[in-house]
Amino acid sequence: MDLGDNELTLTPIPGKSGKAYMGSYPDGKRIFVKMNTSPILPGLAREQIAPQLLWSRRLADGRDMCAQEWLTGKILTPYDMNRKQIVNILTRLHRSRPLMTQLSRLGYAMETPVDLLQSWQETAPDALRKNHFISEVMADLRQTIPGFREDHATIVHGDVRHSNWIETDSGLIYLVDWD
């Protein structure tokens, strides 16, 4: 891959997206590199929700490449998910007006509760949609759905399972995988 930076070597990191790399410099310094990541990554790093963004550049083929600090630590386990730091990070994410403003400027549309129910109805597997219990729950949700207020809208990650959290050796925790 031509990065325009002869010193940086990229090694793929196994994962679902196929867009994550460990970048290595000749002096041994490592960085985390992701192709075509979320455009709100700089804001997430400013809010200390995601690791620090070091740089971003557009490649000749039009793809975007972002570099973040390399974190030494561990992926959280299901048992770790009840920690207060997790609650604090999610609270910061959900209450961040600057991130909401940034998403709005980037053209992201808000999804209302009605939108989410409709999306589920259209994309859920037939076996789930035809399940009697789930059908009753969906009917109840449709009847009791709350009103939507844009001023109360929040950002959500969408996949906060334990494997999307990293704890550094110094004890800091970050939410990752913003695809």
Indicate residue ranges for each PLM-predicted region.
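Short, well-ordered coil/turn elements that cap or connect secondary structure elements
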Residues: 3-5, 45-48, 150, 170
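Intrinsic-disorder/low-complexity loop/linker signature
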Residues: 5-6, 28, 62, 170
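A structural micro-motif
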Residues: 8, 51, 171-173
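ATP-binding pocket architecture of kinase catalytic cores
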Residues: 11-105
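Active-site acidic catalytic loop and adjacent metal/ATP-binding pocket
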Residues: 19-23, 142-179
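A cross-family kinase active-site recognition segment
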Residues: 74-135, 146, 150-153
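Short proline/glycine- and basic residue-enriched helix-capping loop/turn segments at helix->loop/beta transitions
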Residues: 137-141
